[in-house]
């Protein structure tokens, strides 16, 4: 693993360093004031500003602004990235042919460039998936409530599959819906539909929503409708994985 950094290179020195990194399969990161033009399925232009540029050996190219986790412009892998000079500026050109696309970044001032000869053969393995939550609950129903007994996993109804159909210590039916992410109002609505279906033949049926967490708005909606929430915080998601929910869901 090798890391080389050059501060404030001239356009010509930057082009030499960048193309050497591309030839040798290194990751290149650049801090620069630049403007970006995209042409392909649509077209777009991003005016002058300070940005972080990342070029990877597989042709992936990313343009990051100072805030936010998503790149403002990018090129997926499968293409090429090259450096050149044009009208006194250094230029990074990322392009691919299927579909035909190009991202041209004109660097008006390069603050720094880092070459990273990275080695990484690991594969990301996610733990705590929804399937693992189901396995855990099925093996440990007491984690939700003492005396709870699972009768059926993924029972089919006309509204869809209920995650768990159970009975509590008193023999009362319990409909359980499990979510991997923070519980939302959509999840509450789903559980309520299931419970209403069973309440047609048994007024005593209980409804239980299980998730790593829930907002006060969701727990209030559950409480106001006679439903319950159980938190399994150990299955909470971090920034590596979750499905995004709309603000109105909470």
Swiss-Prot record:
Keywords: Cytoplasm, DNA-binding, Endonuclease, Hydrolase, Nuclease. GO terms for cellular component: cytoplasm. Its EC number is 3.1.-.-. CDD domains: NucS-like. GO terms for molecular function: DNA binding; single-stranded DNA endodeoxyribonuclease activity. InterPro entries: Endonuclease_NucS (IPR002793), NucS_C (IPR048301), NucS_N (IPR048302), NucS_N_sf (IPR049173), tRNA_endonuc-like_dom_sf (IPR011856). Its main location: cytoplasm. Signal peptide: none annotated. It is found in: Cytoplasm. It comes from the Archaea. It is an enzyme of class 3 (hydrolase). Cleaves both 3' and 5' ssDNA extremities of branched DNA structures. Belongs to the NucS endonuclease family. This is Endonuclease NucS 2. It comes from Halobacterium salinarum (strain ATCC 700922 / JCM 11081 / NRC-1). The lineage of its organism: Archaea, Methanobacteriati, Methanobacteriota, Stenosarchaea group, Halobacteria.
